[in-house]
Regions:
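Charged, amphipathic alpha-helical coiled-coil/dimerization segments
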Residues: 16, 66-129
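Residues within helix-turn-helix
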Residues: 47-48, 59, 66, 86
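Residues within the alpha-helical elements of helix-turn-helix
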Residues: 38, 53, 71
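Short, locally clustered residues in the helix-turn-helix/winged-helix DNA-binding domain
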Residues: 37-41, 129
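Short capping segments at the starts of secondary-structure elements
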Residues: 42-46
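Short alpha-helical elements of helix-turn-helix
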Residues: 2-6, 26-37, 122
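N-terminal leader segment of winged-helix/HTH proteins
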Residues: 1-26, 71
């Protein structure tokens, strides 16, 4: 396997495990925090809008939303203008998770980039952004 792909694959697996452990401390599973983050930014979005924002399928969002609704973190409400649509809204418990989850994510980022200089960190973010743009373009 090419050097970059191998290193990226191993790093991604480790990062995913660390991120999963961080959100599990708050009763969430990896992915649920991403859905909640979309709603923290703009509450009342449709599953399709959330799917586009986090680059997953609408059925995947629906499944995550069901688990979050069952946990009391969000609720489904019909769209007031289109009866075919459902919108997802945070409950007070869902809103209350924003600060601790964002703090966990920031602490994780700080921990894993602690050995990088500011210049190295900026370069890494710039390089990863360029790679992401190529992949998004290729998959479009």
């Amino acid at each position: 396997m090419p050097e970059f792909l191998e290193l990226h694959s191993k790093t991604s697996k480790l990062l995913r495990a660390a991120a999963d452990a961080a959100v599990q401390r708050h009763g969430l599973r990896l992915g649920q925090d991403h859905l909640l983050a979309v709603l923290w930014a703009e509450d009342g979005r449709t599953p399709g809008e959330i799917a586009a924002a986090v680059n997953v399928t609408t059925p995947a969002v629906t499944k995550l939303a069901t688990r979050l609704a069952d946990s009391g973190l969000l609720e489904r409400r019909p769209d007031p203008h289109d009866n075919r649509l459902v919108r997802l809204w945070l409950t007070p418990a869902g809103r209350a998770l924003q600060e601790p989850i964002e703090a966990e994510r920031q602490a994780l980022e700080d921990r894993i980039t602690a050995t990088l200089t500011q210049a190295e960190r900026a370069h890494l973010i710039k390089a990863l952004t360029k790679i992401q743009q190529v992949l998004v373009s290729d998959l479009a």
